[in-house]
From Swiss-Prot:
PROSITE patterns reported for this sequence: HELICASE_ATP_BIND_1 (PS51192), HELICASE_CTER (PS51194), Q_MOTIF (PS51195)
Catalytic activity, as annotated: ATP + H2O = ADP + phosphate + H(+)
Enzyme type, top EC level: hydrolase
Biological process annotations from GO: maturation of LSU-rRNA from tricistronic rRNA transcript (SSU-rRNA, 5.8S rRNA, LSU-rRNA)
Coiled coil: none
Organism lineage: Eukaryota, Fungi, Dikarya, Ascomycota, Pezizomycotina
Gene for this chain: dbp9
The name this protein goes by in its record: ATP-dependent RNA helicase dbp9
Compartmental location: Nucleus, Nucleolus
Source species: Neosartorya fischeri (strain ATCC 1020 / DSM 3700 / CBS 544.65 / FGSC A1164 / JCM 1740 / NRRL 181 / WB 181)
E.C. designation(s): 3.6.4.13
Function in brief: ATP-binding RNA helicase involved in the biogenesis of 60S ribosomal subunits and is required for the normal formation of 25S and 5.8S rRNAs.
Family matches, as SMART domains: DEXDc (SM00487), HELICc (SM00490)
Keyword list, A-Z: ATP-binding, Helicase, Hydrolase, Nucleotide-binding, Nucleus, Ribosome biogenesis, RNA-binding, rRNA processing
Residue spans of biased composition, Basic and acidic residues class: 16-25, 345-362
Binding site for ATP: A71, K72, T73, G74, S75, G76, K77, T78
């Protein structure tokens, strides 16, 4: 692997300066000597004190040093590299107002994260006027439009590696004057299949570029990127208790495959979990199967997967953070497809790193490979990552806010993925809950319609999860349901599952895509001009692909658990559709029309008996 040369053509040294930090310095944004326009933007965004990663990274970045920072999502790492880059751009523009050149490049693994970074740049450069221009290359626009956007030499570009290489190939983008390179979620960039793009980019970037590598974990992929792009980087390892799952209550439920649906129904219908919930499932079909299943009981939810247009995915996350939706069903496709993409060499390197990490007491994952049952087991075929799934990711990078619970409907295949999933809750010092469904080995495959392949290894994966969490000082507790009371709802679950056929799932997928395409493409410009009308768009509507059974939305009193009544009072339940919204519409319309005299036959007209007036035709 080619190592990056500095401005004097000297290879980077292997020894890097490490900055072990335990507590953030008592610094504020005033002491960082930022441009007044940036400080004004910080005040407007209510940034009062730098986070640990910001207080350490920003001064080093302003000194021109390369930085490799281990920082979790939500720690403020985006501002940690955006502010120094904007500061440098403003200084250059002050010295030469006519300067037009692309000096900053931010690489991210997914479109959702690109949009998130772009929004942060826009907020921080709000008072910079035309001195700072940024472009998001992941937007779904034509090549001609993208070429026009790049023709004006924007100062800062946010993109996935694939889009950068595509524009370099057409000469629409020039990196000749690049001075800053950021790779956000660096450990994901290679695992998402951007290996060739990264290698090509390493050859295209000029020497002496200041590099920021931001990652939630320090893995072999990050070491590869460090060798390609960094020059003696300063390594920041910020010890953050929140990063290790503090404040998250972790529970596990052992259940059969069809009981996952039963327990999910009971949890949401009886409101055993209150607040916003993210449900992780294994693939797109599982998304719609669960959504259609919940629709039978009047439980609304949103779907997030790689098939939906990027604008719809971003809007769903934004509305979820605002509290418009309470339940998101997310397909963690990359966790399933990307788990077998590492080569034998990288696996050996990872195993070696893990041994060292265990000795150091590191919290990194012990193995990144899914559990295989037996030595003689044939390796499963590597699933080809589609173009849509390549730049989609939901368990990492996206900053979900105020999530009360993460529900692992399908258990992830590695303890590393589990850690990233549960990290969506318990943020900013708040309490959170993680509930995982585990299928015992003797229950796997007994209910074919609801079976999922990865559930075969649930018990072995759970053992690794428990072991890792124990090292971190956390306990994964069993969550017990009183199955005698839960079984009273089983016949309803069976009726609902029977209605969610494979054909219904296919129709739901197609209908959802059609609806979201209309919202995303045709109305995009209209909503930019009329932002208030965008609030009327909802993504949790009923797909109505499955057979509707209105009686399932109502829970009779005799089904309500006797012990649970005290905890679920009528005041606490909130609105539940106990009555059908469209009940007896035709009958009500008839009664209303009778009062107006409509539909009545004129008085005096005798009723004709058809049996008396029937004439047999002659032969």
């Amino acid at each position: 692997m080619k190592r990056k040369l500095d401005a004097n053509d000297v290879p980077s040294t292997e020894v890097a300066e490490e900055k072990e930090t335990k507590d953030a310095d008592n610094t504020d944004f005033e002491s960082l000597n930022l441009d007044p326009r940036l400080r004004q933007a910080l005040i407007r965004e209510q940034f009062t004190k730098p986070t640990p990663v910001q207080s350490k990274a920003i001064p080093l970045a302003l000194e021109g040093k390369d930085i490799l920072a281990r920082a979790k999502t939500g720690s403020g790492k985006t501002a940690a590299y955006v502010l120094p880059i904007l500061q440098t751009i403003l200084q250059k523009k002050a010295a030469d107002p006519s300067l037009k050149a692309t000096t900053g490049l931010v690489l991210v693994p997914t479109r959702e994260l690109a949009e998130q970074v772009q929004s942060v740049i826009i907020k921080f450069s709000a008072f910079c006027g035309k001195d700072v221009r940024s472009v998001n290359l992941t937007q779904k626009v034509s090549d001609a439009v993208q070429r026009t956007m790049l023709a004006d030499y924007p100062d800062l570009i946010v993109s996935t590696p694939a889009r950068v290489i595509a524009n370099l190939g057409t000469s629409a983008l020039s990196l000749e004057h690049l001075t800053h390179l950021v790779i956000d979620e660096a450990d994901l960039v290679l695992s998402y299949g951007y290996d060739e793009d990264i290698n090509a980019l390493a050859k295209a970037i000029p020497r002496g570029v200041q590099t920021f590598l931001m990652s939630a974990t320090l893995t072999s992929e990050v070491d590869t990127l460090k060798g390609l792009f960094c020059r003696s980087p300063v390594i920041l390892k910020l010890e953050d208790k929140e990063d290790e799952g503090a404040g998250i209550s972790q529970f596990v439920v052992r259940c059969a495959e069809d009981e996952k649906f039963l327990l999910t129904y009971v949890i949401f219908k009886l409101q055993l979990i209150k607040g916003k919930v993210i449900i992780f499932v294994g693939d797109i079909d599982r998304c719609y199967r669960l959504k259609l299943f919940l629709e039978q009981f009047g439980i609304k939810s949103c779907v997030l997967n790689s098939e939906l247009p990027i604008n719809s995915r971003i809007h769903v996350v934004q509305e979820f953070n605002k509290g418009v939706y309470d339940i998101i069903i997310a397909a963690d496709e990359q966790e399933v497809m990307g788990s077998r993409t590492s080569s034998k060499k990288s696996k050996e390197a990872t195993d070696g790193d893990d041994e060292a990490k265990d000795k150091m007491g590191s919290s990194e994952d012990e193995d990144n490979e899914p559990e295989q049952s037996g030595k003689s087991a044939r390796p499963e075929k590597r699933r080809k990552t589609s173009g849509k799934a390549k730049d989609y990711g939901i368990s990492r990078g996206i900053d979900f806010q105020n999530v009360a619970c993460v529900l692992n409907f399908d258990l992830p295949t590695t303890s590393k993925s589990y850690t990233h999933r549960i990290g969506r809750t318990g943020r900013a010092g708040k309490a959170g809950m993680a509930l995982s469904f585990v299928v015992p080995a003797d229950e796997f495959g007994k209910h074919k319609p609801t079976s999922f392949p990865t559930a075969k290894h649930d018990e072995s994966v759970l053992a690794k999860i428990v072991k890792k969490q124990a090292k971190l000082g956390h306990e994964v507790k069993p969550y017990h349901f009183e199955m005698k009371q839960v079984d009273a709802f089983r016949y309803r679950m069976t009726d609902a599952l029977r209605a969610v056929t494979r054909l219904a799932i296919q129709e739901a997928r197609a209908r959802e895509i059609r609806q979201e395409l209309v919202k995303s493409e045709k109305l995009k410009r209209h909503f930019e001009e009329n932002p208030e009308e965008l609030k009327q768009l909802r993504h949790d509507g009923e797909l109505r692909a499955a057979r509707i059974q209105p009686h399932l939305k109502h829970i009779p009193d005799y089904l309500m658990p006797s012990k649970g009544r005290k905890g679920i009072s009528s005041e606490d339940v909130g609105f539940v559709g106990f009555r059908k919204s469209g009940d007896n519409r035709i009958r009500k319309a008839r009664e209303k029309n009778r009062g107006k005299g409509k539909g009545r036959k004129p008085s005096g007209v005798r009723k004709v008996d058809p049996l008396k007036t029937f004439n047999r035709g002659r032969k």
